[in-house]
């Protein structure tokens, strides 16, 4: 009976085909683990087996101690993405790094991401970055002008900001009465 190893199970490993894999890590240790993997790759002269290591992050601005500070938020906390040729040797290199808890997939054979799954992750990163950027454009209490829809040209005051849904609740005056309406970020503009 043949021993079950990655080299025996995955045909891609023999052809030097690099695919994306998801690695689960200890919480908050993603950067250190990425650096440790890169050091070990160089030390063991295995650069041909690895193409890229990503920590999916996007930048957001936050107010800390009264100052606007740019910080990185993780799209997938406790996970890193590695584009690699999966062999027994490369699998062991990553798996034996302190803080790595495993690959996504079965215990014996990690599951490579499909092109659509990878594209979805990159699209989510882009969308999160856009939401973070747009949500910082508006502040509660700020006066804006509606630029689209039935209330186009109405002026209103921002009451709530929903960053997840990319929406604002704006209070506009209709027949002299303040009426709250929900709008997308792209349906309003700041007043100069």
Curated annotation (Swiss-Prot):
Keyword Ribosomal protein carried by entry: no
Gene Ontology biological-process annotations: DNA-templated transcription termination; regulation of DNA-templated transcription elongation; transcription antitermination; transcription elongation-coupled chromatin remodeling
SUPFAM superfamilies, sorted: N-utilization substance G protein NusG, N-terminal domain (SSF82679), Translation proteins SH3-like domain (SSF50104)
Domain KOW: 140-168
InterPro entries (alphabetical): KOW, NGN, NGN-like_dom, NGN_dom_sf, NusG-like, Rib_uL2_dom2, Transcrpt_antiterm_NusG, Transcrpt_antiterm_NusG_bac_CS
Alphabetic keyword roster: Transcription, Transcription antitermination, Transcription regulation, Transcription termination
SMART domains assigned: KOW (SM00739), NGN (SM00738)
Keyword set includes Transcription regulation: yes
CDD domains, per database record: KOW_NusG, NGN_Bact_1
GO cellular component: cytosol
PROSITE patterns named among the record's database cross-references: NUSG
Family to which this protein belongs: Belongs to the NusG family.
Protein role: Participates in transcription elongation, termination and antitermination.
Name by which UniProt lists this protein: Transcription termination/antitermination protein NusG
């Amino acid at each position: 009976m043949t021993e079950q190893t990655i080299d025996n199970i995955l045909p891609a490993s023999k052809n030097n085909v690099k695919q994306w894999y998801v690695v689960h890590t200890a919480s908050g240790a993603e950067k250190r683990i990425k650096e440790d993997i890169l050091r070990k790759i160089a030390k063991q002269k295995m650069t041909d087996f690895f193409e890229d290591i990503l920590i999916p992050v996007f930048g957001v601005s936050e107010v800390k101690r009264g100052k606007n500070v740019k910080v990185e938020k993780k799209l997938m906390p406790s996970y890193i993405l590695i584009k690699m040729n999966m062999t027994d040797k490369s699998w062991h290199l990553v798996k034996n790094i302190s803080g790595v808890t495993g690959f996504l997939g079965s215990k014996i054979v990690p599951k490579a991401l499909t092109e659509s799954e990878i594209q979805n992750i990159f699209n989510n990163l882009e969308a999160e970055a856009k939401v973070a950027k747009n949500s910082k454009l508006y502040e509660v209490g700020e006066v804006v002008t509606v630029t689209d829809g039935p209330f186009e040209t109405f002026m209103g005051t921002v009451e709530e900001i929903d960053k997840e849904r990319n929406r604002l609740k704006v209070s506009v005056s209709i027949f002299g009465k303040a009426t709250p309406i929900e709008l997308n970020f792209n349906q309003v503009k700041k007043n100069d």
